[in-house]
């Protein structure tokens, strides 16, 4: 396990170096001078120190022509909001690996909404899911909240929501999908019993 982690770390460092080179090349290219590169703000939320997934996302986004501002790990919600107000990103990416990060992501997007921010927010990390994003995170935000299964999905998803030709369709598809997930979760939920009823229904193993 230790050897594997070291190999992953080494691979990531090589990828980050490649991304820095790609970013420098893009900055000097005619394409970059002609058009503004979309800006992505990345952060691992407060309480979470894991950053490998976030760093990989950053590498992928840079290699796809995005400008990435990485705030690192354990980033308080207020700091994310202040940075977003300062740099006006086109997309915000929130990462988390542990279960408490899910509640923190809800807190972050709520503060973003209160600050008048509605740019697309992308959610990723081992504990995140399409269902949790639809049930808990998306309802407290004005803009789109998009769950990405892995790092490879972030760039094409962001492009779809930022492109004027595909934005409306992407928003419509996302809203319909999340509405279906919320409806399905509501239908699957079972009624809760009182303590007395639960005791009456207890299984008899003898």
Go through each PLM region and give its residues.
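Secondary-structure transition/capping motifs at alpha-helix termini
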Residues: 62-69, 86-91, 111-120, 139-143
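Arg/Gly-rich low-complexity intrinsically disordered repeat tracts
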Residues: 2-13
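Short acidic loop-to-helix transition motifs that present clustered carboxylates
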Residues: 73-80, 128-130, 153-154
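ATP-dependent carboxylate/acyl-activation modules
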Residues: 1-2, 25-94
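Active-site-adjacent beta->alpha loops and helix N-cap segments on the catalytic face
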Residues: 77, 100-109
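Glycine-rich, charge-decorated loop segments at or immediately adjacent to ligand/cofactor-binding or catalytic sites
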Residues: 127-142
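Active-site loops and adjacent core secondary-structure elements that bind or stabilize anionic groups
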Residues: 152-206
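Glycine-rich beta-strand-to-loop/alpha-helix junction loops that act as flexible
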Residues: 93-97, 121-126
């Amino acid at each position: 396990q230790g050897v594997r982690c070291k190999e992953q770390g080494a691979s990531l460092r090589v990828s980050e170096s490649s991304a820095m080179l790609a970013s420098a090349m893009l900055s000097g290219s005619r394409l970059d001078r002609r058009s503004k590169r979309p800006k992505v703000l990345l952060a691992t939320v407060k309480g979470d120190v894991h950053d490998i997934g976030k760093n990989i996302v950053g590498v992928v986004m840079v290699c796809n022509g995005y400008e990435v501002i990485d705030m690192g790990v354990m980033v308080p919600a207020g700091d994310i909001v202040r940075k977003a107000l300062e740099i006006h990103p086109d997309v915000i990416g929130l990462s988390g690996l542990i279960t408490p990060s899910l509640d923190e992501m809800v807190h972050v997007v709520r503060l973003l909404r209160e600050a008048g921010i509605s740019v697309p927010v992308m959610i990723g990390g081992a504990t995140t899911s399409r269902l949790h994003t639809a049930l808990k995170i998306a309802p407290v935000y004005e803009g789109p909240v998009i769950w990405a299964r892995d790092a490879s999905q972030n760039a094409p998803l962001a492009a779809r929501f930022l492109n004027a030709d595909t934005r409306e369709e992407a928003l419509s598809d996302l809203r319909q999908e999340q509405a279906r997930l919320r409806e399905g979760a509501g239908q699957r939920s079972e009624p809760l019993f009182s303590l007395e009823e639960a005791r009456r229904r207890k299984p008899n193993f003898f």
